[in-house]
């Protein structure tokens, strides 16, 4: 059982052996009582569970509280590395059924980041490396520097699971919801499973991927109301 205790402006979380701290010895604290109670309840589940996805939730949570100026800069550099390999820029064989589905689902997301952020992404059929507009890196860097710790954490983990800055930008801008995010990043896997039949190993990997994705979204939703205040 995790207890929530208010000290000054913040609510802190306690287990039997004391205040809950991150791997870098930072205390977990929030300013909103509703968020604090919800987080305490879910952390209790995670600490009790032997499920690796629940441990992953705690890792992501701790990651967000451990971000400082130096580590934030390192994370931004890692995110920028994905610019040239964005999932949404690489399409299936021209005029194929899958390519048609990719255009319908992915093109609106590319148009959104172009209109809102002036980020220009090119697409190709196949895996040949693409050269994008030179201003993309600087513009994305400015966007990322404005994100708070939680936002940057969510962005970073979505990037790691989707390999797409375009998807992450659309999600944090509230242009798409989490269901749409999953549909976009799992399009090819879902298509192959339906087209070629169920592959036990591939299906298990996709389900595992979704379970980790759900934990990222769980953290985002816990703090969403706090972000909007």
Kindly give the residue locations of the regions a language model identified.
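Short cationic amphipathic helices and targeting signals
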Residues: 26-30, 87-90, 97, 167
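Internal, conserved structured core segments that host functional sites
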Residues: 73-139
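Buried hydrophobic packing segments
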Residues: 39-40, 167-171
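A contiguous pocket-lining binding segment that forms or flanks enzyme active sites
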Residues: 123-169
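An N-terminal structural lobe/cap that precedes and organizes the functional/catalytic core
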Residues: 1-70
């Amino acid at each position: 059982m995790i207890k929530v205790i208010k000290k000054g402006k913040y609510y802190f979380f306690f287990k039997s052996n004391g205040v809950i701290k991150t791997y870098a010895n930072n205390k977990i604290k929030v300013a909103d009582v509703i968020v604090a109670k919800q987080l305490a309840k879910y952390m209790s589940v995670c600490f009790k569970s032997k499920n690796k996805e629940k441990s992953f939730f705690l890792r992501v949570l701790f990651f967000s509280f451990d971000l400082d100026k130096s580590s934030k800069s390192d994370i931004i550099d890692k995110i920028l590395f994905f610019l040239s390999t964005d999932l949404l820029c690489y399409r299936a064989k021209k005029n194929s059924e899958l390519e048609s589905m990719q255009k319908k689902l992915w093109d609106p997301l590319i148009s959104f980041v172009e209109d809102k952020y002036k980020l220009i992404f090119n697409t190709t059929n196949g895996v040949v490396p693409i050269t994008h507009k030179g201003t993309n890196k600087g513009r994305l860097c400015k966007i990322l520097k404005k994100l708070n710790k939680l936002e940057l954490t969510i962005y970073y983990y979505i990037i790691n699971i989707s390999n797409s800055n375009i998807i992450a930008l659309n999600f944090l801008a509230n242009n798409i919801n989490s269901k749409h995010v999953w549909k976009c990043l799992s399009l090819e896997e879902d298509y192959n499973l339906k087209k070629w039949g169920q592959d036990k190993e591939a299906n298990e990997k996709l389900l595992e991927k979704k379970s980790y994705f759900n934990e990222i979204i769980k953290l985002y939703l816990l703090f969403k109301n706090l972000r909007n205040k």
